[in-house]
Amino acid sequence: AVVIVATVRALKMNGGVAKDNLAEENLDALKAGSANLLRHLDNVAKYGVPAVVAINRFPTDTEAELELLRDLCKEKGIDVVLSEVFAKGGEGGMELAKEVINICENQKSDFHTLYDVNDSIEDKMNTIATEIYGADGVDFTADALKQVRELEKLGLDRLPICVAKTQYSFTDDPKKLGAPKNFRITVREVKVSAGAGFIVALTGSIMTMPGLPKVPAANGMDILSDGTIIGLS
């Protein structure tokens, strides 16, 4: 089973709400932003695996907002479960755990991939872009195409593809939220991670390392004189 984690806040942001206003109830924005979640649900369905949506609940989430999400997901035959692990510890995840067990025991999984690893790099990337991101297609820069040809000569082109792309959007532009249509993905660089066994296609201005926020959490961690560790939460 696949667990898709979502938050009311993130979906409202995808619906156009400014960060400072995310604590306010906004059903219209939530419904608009939920197009992002629904596309993720469609994507999981393409792999033939049953899913459940786990709402990572915040204190500002209203019952009306949670009910709206339940209704939207129910239309696709997907159950919504609240996850309150952060506030309640393990107890807050019991409902989700039970639902995952229920799905595994009572729903069939027919997992399959969307492309054959023996397809060309261009074809594999096009499948990812059109089937998962909802793009119209893929454009490779001249440098990226040259790198593709080099991988073909080395016999390293028959590997799965890992796309390095902004996490904020289905496009390669982090500002295009929701579930955009009528766009193309541009691959600017292609390289191979031979040890890991996959090809990396870089898009937009994404960096593959370091995967850290502007202020890493480690900056707030410390060990007191008595050995107590602070700043982990």
Model-predicted regions and their roles:
Residues R9-L30:
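A solvent-exposed, charged loop/short amphipathic helix patch at secondary-structure junctions
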Residues A1-A10:
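Inter-motif core of Ras-like GTPase G domains
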Residues N36, P50-A51:
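Cap/lid and interdomain-hinge subdomains that line or gate substrate/regulatory clefts
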Residues I4, V53-I55:
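Structural beta-sheet core signal
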Residues A29, Y168-S233:
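C-terminal effector/interaction modules appended to NTPase cores
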Residues T7, A164-T166, T203:
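Structured loops at beta-to-helix junctions and adjacent beta-edge loops in soluble globular domains
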Residues L30-G33, L37:
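Aromatic/hydrophobic pocket-lining residues that form the small-molecule binding cavity
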Residues H40, A45-G48, I55, T60-T62, ...:
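Hard-cation-handling environments
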